[in-house]
Amino acid sequence: MPAEGANPFAQFAQALQWDRARWIWLLCAVLALDLVLGLGDSVAAILRYDRSAIAAGGWWRLLTAHIVHLDLHHLLLNELGLVLVWALFADDYDPLEWCIIVLSGALAISSGLWWLSPRVSWYVGLSGVLHTIMGAGCARHLAVRAWDRWILIGCLAAKLAYEQLGGHEPALVVVDAHLYGAISGFVVGALLSWRVAIIRQRSRAAGPSPSLRR
């Protein structure tokens, strides 16, 4: 990680993640989202978060709702968001950790909608999971004392507060999903960072130790 006193612009350039393998994963994710949209409305109806359908046993919707989109415009907005957050946070965790973060975030969002937002009858889209990624990234940047940690946390907190205080169009955006996603991502990211820190402390005397990414 660059020193905190280094040139902020140089640090930001280094913070962007351009590892080829990770961008191949991103491309695969984008293509998968495109494929789901191309399957049509009948498939989307089977995959989306639908409160009555989940109550009837459609538990898979708790996960699949996050890969379904309303239309091409909705999909492209979320794919753009995915590219941006991936550029900032891709290298903060290894592939297994990212799987844990994304899956736990998807479940946390759907569970939050189920238990805490009963008025939400249906939901689709990746935006909640994007906030999970942002929350996890903020947790890791905070753990390693990255120069941009307070900027990222402040921007995310301000966005969530703005949405929760009514600065959105409630008919179009389920902002509770953003809140649940960000909280779950931050918590899981903090736990993963704490785990690595503990392992590093315990193995310090034994030789090379795991390091927090960034």
Task: Enumerate the predicted regions with their spans.
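Helix-boundary and loop/linker segments of multi-pass membrane transporters
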Residues: L16-D19, R51-G57, V144
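N-terminal TM1-TM2 helical hairpin plus the immediately adjacent luminal interfacial "cap"
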Residues: W25-S110, W114-Y123, V173
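Alpha-helical transmembrane segments that form the membrane-embedded catalytic/substrate-binding core
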Residues: L75-L82, V124-G135, V173-S193
